[in-house]
């Protein structure tokens, strides 16, 4: 057991000075005023550093010199490990690896890799973010137009069956219809609107169906 001292602590609710973080068995046991520390506990000074909960990046295509969605060879556990190490240098402890519009085969590979990574490294990546392929072509941005398409039942069912490793799907609601949105949301996937040219009516229908 030891205490981290002489840092400014941001809890998410308040800013604490003259406090310590007590660590026991690798976990935070408590946060307390310095004056309440047991006299015998080891103190490790942080020399005025800022202490806060780790940041979470909910859309990360690549970092650390790698891209998760470049080629099939890049969609690997090793790529995700490199991204995790790069994230930690700037205080980002968790993230959603993001695979942009691609073929069914590459999406399924990404899902398999995500499952393998989560089994090997729990509590780092928080699941896969599939950005596309059900986007509006006029708002595709840098997404490959060859793979921008409307949903098919087989892929939707596959995604729902693997919802335990797919955290988020970004889609254009006017391209999918409400049934697909409802099905994904019911499976526990966060559905986000993006790369969309929806009318107000189409957008409202999408939000009612489960877009958050």
Locations of regions flagged by a protein language model:
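Active-site gating loops and adjacent loop-to-helix segments of metal-dependent hydrolytic enzymes
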Residues: 61-66, 73-76, 85-96, 137-163, ...
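Generic structural signal for well-ordered alpha-helices
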Residues: 80-84, 108-115, 156, 181, ...
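Divalent metal-dependent hydrolysis catalytic cores, especially in the metallo-beta-lactamase
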Residues: 61-63, 81-110, 123-136, 163-174, ...
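N-terminal metal-binding scaffold of metallo-dependent hydrolase/deaminase domains
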Residues: 1-37
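Short amphipathic alpha-helices and their capping/turn segments at secondary-structure boundaries
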Residues: 39-42, 46-49, 110-122, 204-208
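Divalent metal-coordination and catalytic microenvironments
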Residues: 7, 21, 26, 48, ...
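Histidine/acidic residue-rich metal-binding segments in metalloenzymes
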Residues: 119, 149-212
């Amino acid at each position: 057991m030891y205490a981290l001292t002489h840092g400014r602590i941001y809890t998410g609710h308040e800013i604490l000075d003259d406090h310590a973080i007590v660590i026991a068995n690798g976990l935070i046991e408590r946060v307390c005023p310095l004056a309440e520390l047991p006299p015998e506990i080891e103190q490790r000074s942080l020399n005025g550093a800022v202490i806060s909960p780790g940041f979470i990046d909910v859309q990360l295509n690549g970092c650390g010199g790698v891209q998760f969605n470049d080629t099939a060879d890049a969609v690997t556990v090793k790529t995700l490990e490199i991204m995790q190490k790069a994230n930690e240098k700037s205080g980002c402890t968790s993230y959603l690896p993001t695979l942009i519009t691609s073929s069914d085969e590459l999406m399924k590979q990404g899902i398999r890799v995500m499952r393998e990574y989560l089994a090997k490294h729990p509590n780092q990546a928080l699941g896969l973010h599939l950005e596309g392929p059900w986007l509006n072509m006029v708002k595709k941005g840098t997404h490959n137009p060859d793979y921008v398409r409307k949903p098919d039942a087989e892929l939707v069912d596959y995604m729902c069956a693997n919802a335990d490793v797919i955290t988020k799907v970004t889609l254009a609601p006017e391209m999918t219809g409400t049934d697909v949105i409802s099905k994904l949301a019911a499976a526990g996937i966060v559905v986000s609107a993006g790369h969309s040219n929806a009318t107000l009516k189409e957008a409202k229908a999408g939000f009612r169906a489960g877009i958050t």
